A protein has these predicted regions:
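Class I SAM-dependent methyltransferase Rossmann-like catalytic core
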Residues: 2-56
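Conserved class I S-adenosyl-L-methionine
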Residues: 62-70, 176-201
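Conserved SAM-binding loop of SAM-dependent methyltransferases across substrates and taxa
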Residues: 71-84
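S-adenosyl-L-methionine
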Residues: 100-134
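A short, conserved alpha-helix within the catalytic core of class I
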Residues: 153-165
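Short alpha-helix
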Residues: 211-228
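C-terminal lobe and adjacent flexible extensions of AdoMet/dcAdoMet transferase-like proteins
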Residues: 244-288
């Protein structure tokens, strides 16, 4: 594989947004948000592989399954990384009218209609365990990615079954499992509100909310090992500059009238909110 020269990550993120969402060029705040989210996904690639250049060289021409693709933030970064001869199978069971300010249908159609990245992505709207069980070829892939999707899932038991399904579908293939999730660790005091907001929503999940459970890296690691995966490299990204912390604080405030454990966590959250809310640290892991 020939080494690839990688542009500055900020310039690359801006270029990817220009390719997949050119209308944002006249909207400064949505453009800032989209670029920061893409920068973060590129940083995830760098964390998994040691550098963005190493990620590009490893993924070029490969087939990648992304589980929990949502509106495609990680999908775009993966489509760039696999190049013109690679492929991304992006799986998400959520209804296509889910999501705001852009639904999954709108976001996925927008990416599909972009060139050349859109042609590298196949969207699969079904439960990922069912998808892996029904399509034998789907599991024999090079990499399986779960980026900020575990907290959306219905239970830790389901995550354990998902890890088993991916391991079983991979068979003798040397598939690698790449995980990135909020690590329930705070290195910036301004991120404490994000942690409490996630804990509150996990204690009393919102019907249409993002957070459905609380999961620390140790528990995720144990679920994966019990499913037959072997530990690999782990890295942390400290308090990434994205807006998720503020979004989760806003979502948690809709639980203001609730009781129980969630009420106490909301009080803790409000007590530490002081100015802009930063994000928790992100835990990344590569399993074999």
């Amino acid at each position: 594989m020939t080494n690839t020269t990688i542009p500055d990550i900020n310039d690359l993120a801006a270029s990817l947004i220009q390719q997949t969402n050119p209308s944002l060029s006249s909207e400064p705040e949505p453009s800032r948000i989209a670029i920061s989210q893409t920068q973060h996904r590129l940083n995830l690639l760098a964390a998994w592989f040691g550098s963005l250049e190493a990620a590009k060289n490893a993924l070029e021409g490969k087939t990648v399954i992304e589980i929990g693709c949502g509106q495609g933030d990680m999908t775009v970064a993966l489509a760039w990384a696999v190049g013109s001869t690679g492929k991304v199978d992006a799986i998400d069971p959520a209804p296509l009218d889910y999501g705001s300010p852009e639904t999954l249908r709108e976001a996925q159609n927008r990416i599909s209609n972009s060139s050349p990245l859109g042609g590298r992505v196949d969207w699969i709207q079904t439960d990922p365990i069912e998808a892996l069980e029904q399509d034998a070829e789907l599991g024999a892939t090079d990499y399986v990615v779960l980026a900020h999707s575990l907290l959306y899932m219905r239970s830790t038991a389901y995550i354990g079954e998902l890890f088993k399904a991916v391991r079983s579908a991979a068979g003798p293939a040397s598939t690698q499992l790449l995980i990135a999730e909020w690590g329930m660790r705070v290195s910036n005091e301004s991120a404490k509100a994000h942690l409490y907001a996630v804990q509150a929503q996990a204690a009393r999940p919102l019907e249409s909310g993002n957070v459905q459970l609380y999961l620390e890296p140790k528990a995720t690691r144990e679920l994966a090992i019990n499913a037959g995966w072997k530990e690999g490299e782990e890295r942390w990204i400290e308090s990434p500059e994205v807006d998720d912390g503020a979004w989760e604080v806003a979502a948690a405030r809709s639980l203001a009238d609730t009781g129980g454990a969630a009420r106490g966590l909301l009080e803790d959250m409000e007590r530490v909110v002081d100015g802009p809310t930063r994000c928790m640290d992100v835990w990344t892991s590569v399993l074999h």
